[in-house]
């Protein structure tokens, strides 16, 4: 029995944990106020996985849930205190080799503000317009379409 590999990420009201177990069977997820216990049989060899996580902060076990797919089990933990950032998933600072941050879904929601997003939207619009207007006539550049030989078109000497 060994822990399943997992990825996690933080949101304003929820913490998400994805246990990466393909073809899982007999999935059991137990949500407690400050602990999560996950177990299942996984893969074609029905290997037994068990993860016990002492959580960084409390959650609402009644409003937390999980969903199984063919590739993983996604747990959605409702934070006990909404809007509180979790700098890590576990209570202890110890590095767990089976647990990593899901940077594909990570979002720094603490710094979000409408003003910041409006600046980003303006920047994005400016970048889109940098390609120029397609209807603009550009001046002719001498030799741009010329098929004449340049000095760098000469034959290279053979290597010795």
Swiss-Prot record:
<feature type="site" description="Cleavage; by caspase-7">
    <location>
        <begin position="142"/>
        <end position="143"/>
    </location>
</feature>
<dbReference type="GO" id="GO:0006457">
    <property type="term" value="P:protein folding"/>
</dbReference>
<dbReference type="GO" id="GO:0003720">
    <property type="term" value="F:telomerase activity"/>
</dbReference>
<dbReference type="GO" id="GO:0051085">
    <property type="term" value="P:chaperone cofactor-dependent protein refolding"/>
</dbReference>
<protein>
    <recommendedName>
        <fullName>Prostaglandin E synthase 3</fullName>
        <ecNumber>5.3.99.3</ecNumber>
    </recommendedName>
</protein>
<dbReference type="GO" id="GO:0070182">
    <property type="term" value="F:DNA polymerase binding"/>
</dbReference>
<feature type="cross-link" description="Glycyl lysine isopeptide (Lys-Gly) (interchain with G-Cter in SUMO2)">
    <location>
        <position position="35"/>
    </location>
</feature>
<feature type="region of interest" description="Disordered">
    <location>
        <begin position="124"/>
        <end position="160"/>
    </location>
</feature>
<feature type="modified residue" description="Phosphoserine">
    <location>
        <position position="85"/>
    </location>
</feature>
<dbReference type="GO" id="GO:0007165">
    <property type="term" value="P:signal transduction"/>
</dbReference>
<keyword id="KW-0644">Prostaglandin metabolism</keyword>
<feature type="modified residue" description="Phosphoserine">
    <location>
        <position position="113"/>
    </location>
</feature>
<keyword id="KW-0007">Acetylation</keyword>
<dbReference type="GO" id="GO:0000723">
    <property type="term" value="P:telomere maintenance"/>
</dbReference>
<dbReference type="GO" id="GO:0051087">
    <property type="term" value="F:protein-folding chaperone binding"/>
</dbReference>
<keyword id="KW-0143">Chaperone</keyword>
<keyword id="KW-0832">Ubl conjugation</keyword>
<keyword id="KW-1017">Isopeptide bond</keyword>
<dbReference type="InterPro" id="IPR045250">
    <property type="entry name" value="p23-like"/>
</dbReference>
<dbReference type="GO" id="GO:0005829">
    <property type="term" value="C:cytosol"/>
</dbReference>
<dbReference type="GO" id="GO:0051082">
    <property type="term" value="F:unfolded protein binding"/>
</dbReference>
<dbReference type="GO" id="GO:0051879">
    <property type="term" value="F:Hsp90 protein binding"/>
</dbReference>
<feature type="compositionally biased region" description="Acidic residues">
    <location>
        <begin position="132"/>
        <end position="153"/>
    </location>
</feature>
<feature type="short sequence motif" description="PXLE motif">
    <location>
        <begin position="157"/>
        <end position="160"/>
    </location>
</feature>
<feature type="modified residue" description="Phosphoserine">
    <location>
        <position position="148"/>
    </location>
</feature>
<keyword id="KW-0275">Fatty acid biosynthesis</keyword>
<comment type="function">
    <text>Cytosolic prostaglandin synthase that catalyzes the oxidoreduction of prostaglandin endoperoxide H2 (PGH2) to prostaglandin E2 (PGE2). Molecular chaperone that localizes to genomic response elements in a hormone-dependent manner and disrupts receptor-mediated transcriptional activation, by promoting disassembly of transcriptional regulatory complexes. Facilitates HIF alpha proteins hydroxylation via interaction with EGLN1/PHD2, leading to recruit EGLN1/PHD2 to the HSP90 pathway.</text>
</comment>
<feature type="domain" description="CS">
    <location>
        <begin position="1"/>
        <end position="90"/>
    </location>
</feature>
<keyword id="KW-0276">Fatty acid metabolism</keyword>
<dbReference type="Pfam" id="PF04969">
    <property type="entry name" value="CS"/>
</dbReference>
<feature type="modified residue" description="Phosphoserine">
    <location>
        <position position="151"/>
    </location>
</feature>
<keyword id="KW-0413">Isomerase</keyword>
<feature type="modified residue" description="Phosphoserine">
    <location>
        <position position="118"/>
    </location>
</feature>
<feature type="modified residue" description="N6-acetyllysine">
    <location>
        <position position="33"/>
    </location>
</feature>
<dbReference type="GO" id="GO:0005634">
    <property type="term" value="C:nucleus"/>
</dbReference>
<keyword id="KW-0444">Lipid biosynthesis</keyword>
<dbReference type="GO" id="GO:0046457">
    <property type="term" value="P:prostanoid biosynthetic process"/>
</dbReference>
<dbReference type="InterPro" id="IPR008978">
    <property type="entry name" value="HSP20-like_chaperone"/>
</dbReference>
<feature type="modified residue" description="Phosphoserine">
    <location>
        <position position="44"/>
    </location>
</feature>
<comment type="pathway">
    <text>Lipid metabolism; prostaglandin biosynthesis.</text>
</comment>
<feature type="cross-link" description="Glycyl lysine isopeptide (Lys-Gly) (interchain with G-Cter in SUMO2)">
    <location>
        <position position="65"/>
    </location>
</feature>
<dbReference type="GO" id="GO:1905323">
    <property type="term" value="P:telomerase holoenzyme complex assembly"/>
</dbReference>
């Amino acid at each position: 029995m060994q822990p399943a590999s997992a990825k996690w990420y933080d949101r304003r009201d929820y913490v998400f944990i994805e246990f990466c177990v393909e073809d899982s069977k007999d999935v059991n997820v137990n949500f407690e106020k400050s602990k999560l216990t996950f177990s299942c049989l996984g893969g074609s060899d029905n290997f037994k996985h068990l993860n016990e996580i002492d959580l960084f902060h409390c959650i609402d076990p009644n409003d937390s849930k999980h969903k199984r797919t063919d590739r993983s089990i996604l747990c959605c933990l409702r934070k006990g205190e909404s809007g509180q950032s979790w700098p890590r998933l576990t209570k202890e600072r110890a590095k767990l080799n089976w647990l990593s941050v899901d940077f594909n879904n990570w979002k720094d929601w603490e710094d979000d503000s409408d003003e910041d997003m409006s600046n980003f939207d303006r920047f994005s619009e400016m970048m889109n317009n940098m390609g120029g207007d397609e209807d603009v006539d550009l001046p002719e550049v001498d030799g741009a379409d010329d098929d004449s030989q340049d000095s760098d078109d000469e034959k290279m000497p053979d290597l010795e």
